[in-house]
């Protein structure tokens, strides 16, 4: 059994925060993420500090923004049209890159607003960061604090905060696509005399139509059951915990920190991080469909093979160790 979650977050009631956008409900076509940084605590020649860029259809999100993230965005071609930034916690290696990033956005002439999300004390720390580059930040900036179970609704998907176990107040995140419409049975629609064209679209939107015969055709006559959306889960910095197991249940991808190896177990306990074996155990317990390890100690910078082997001892599904620039597209579920 894993501990439930960290002591720093009160249970509270879940809140739904709706982004100031037209929020749709038809899911997404594209879900792709790119690792901007995969190193723990300090950068190396090969690995930058924590950062993940997620492309969700037309939207671009950042999860953490370690020092040097904006250069990585240039290097890996993610673009700078970021719609929101989500911070897992406020250790320096996860957020100091926001200072230069905001300044660059201002110098690029950005005019539309940007929202920064994170656990308390997000407002205090991020305001301080903004002030360091204030002479060039000329666009609306909103800072919102999240807690366990809070949800942020965005077009076609929701981002949910998960309270985890770290040395300070920390969150993991679940990006969950809205349910997608069931499959449209073209042959059944034609057999029922449904007019091709707009009536097909109405049925797919859940509206009844009148067939050529005069009979009313219900959506359930030609549209299959709704299909579950994709789920991308990011642990952030954490000890293995039941909250992350629950969050990653049947996830398409679980990105879990794996700072240490087995022989560094005591260090993992002291610093409130996970070993690769523990990350594998979380993925197995959750039934995650794919596990990607990240946030590696510099000791494993160029040769993460031990981490991979130790995670493999616990988890038999698709397994990789992330590297900077690694880009993954999450396929649609059947």
Regions from the language model: what does each represent?
Residues 28-78, 113, 173-175, 182, ...:
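Conserved beta-strand hairpin/beta-sheet module of binuclear metal-dependent hydrolase folds
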Residues 53, 147-293, 304-309, 331-334:
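Metal-dependent phosphodiesterase/nuclease catalytic metal-binding core
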Residues 63-66, 83-90, 119, 233-238, ...:
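Active-site neighborhood of phospho(di)ester-bond hydrolases with catalytic His/Asp-centered motifs
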Residues 67-117, 145:
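Active-site metal-binding motif and surrounding structural segment of the metallo-beta-lactamase
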Residues 110-145, 299:
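Active-site neighborhood of divalent metal-dependent phosphoester bond hydrolases
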